[in-house]
Amino acid sequence: MAKEDVIEIQGTIKETLPNAMFKVELENGAEILAHVSGKIRMHYIRILPGDKVTVEMSPYDLTKGRITYRFK
C-alpha cells in the first residue's frame, strides 16, 4: 500500500480485544477495529483503554486500521 493512500485520524481506545486488537472511537464518532503497528509492538509500548492514539486507515476498508502513535 502506498503512503499517499493512507488516511490518518485521531481516536480514543474504547476496549482491548485479544491478539493486540483494539476498539477505537474516532473523532468523527465512528468505531473501528485497529491493530498495533510493528514499531509500537517492538518497543513494548502499552496501550490501555482511554488512551488517545493516531490511527492509519486504508481508503478501501474504513472499518479497520493500524495504531501508529500513542499520545503521552
Curated annotation (Swiss-Prot):
<keyword id="KW-0648">Protein biosynthesis</keyword>
<protein>
    <recommendedName>
        <fullName>Translation initiation factor IF-1</fullName>
    </recommendedName>
</protein>
<comment type="function">
    <text>One of the essential components for the initiation of protein synthesis. Stabilizes the binding of IF-2 and IF-3 on the 30S subunit to which N-formylmethionyl-tRNA(fMet) subsequently binds. Helps modulate mRNA selection, yielding the 30S pre-initiation complex (PIC). Upon addition of the 50S ribosomal subunit IF-1, IF-2 and IF-3 are released leaving the mature 70S translation initiation complex.</text>
</comment>
<dbReference type="GO" id="GO:0005829">
    <property type="term" value="C:cytosol"/>
</dbReference>
<dbReference type="InterPro" id="IPR012340">
    <property type="entry name" value="NA-bd_OB-fold"/>
</dbReference>
<comment type="similarity">
    <text>Belongs to the IF-1 family.</text>
</comment>
<dbReference type="GO" id="GO:0019843">
    <property type="term" value="F:rRNA binding"/>
</dbReference>
<dbReference type="InterPro" id="IPR004368">
    <property type="entry name" value="TIF_IF1"/>
</dbReference>
<dbReference type="Pfam" id="PF01176">
    <property type="entry name" value="eIF-1a"/>
</dbReference>
<comment type="subunit">
    <text>Component of the 30S ribosomal translation pre-initiation complex which assembles on the 30S ribosome in the order IF-2 and IF-3, IF-1 and N-formylmethionyl-tRNA(fMet); mRNA recruitment can occur at any time during PIC assembly.</text>
</comment>
<feature type="domain" description="S1-like">
    <location>
        <begin position="2"/>
        <end position="72"/>
    </location>
</feature>
<dbReference type="InterPro" id="IPR003029">
    <property type="entry name" value="S1_domain"/>
</dbReference>
<keyword id="KW-0699">rRNA-binding</keyword>
<dbReference type="GO" id="GO:0003743">
    <property type="term" value="F:translation initiation factor activity"/>
</dbReference>
<dbReference type="InterPro" id="IPR006196">
    <property type="entry name" value="RNA-binding_domain_S1_IF1"/>
</dbReference>
<dbReference type="GO" id="GO:0043022">
    <property type="term" value="F:ribosome binding"/>
</dbReference>
<keyword id="KW-0396">Initiation factor</keyword>
<keyword id="KW-0963">Cytoplasm</keyword>
<keyword id="KW-0694">RNA-binding</keyword>
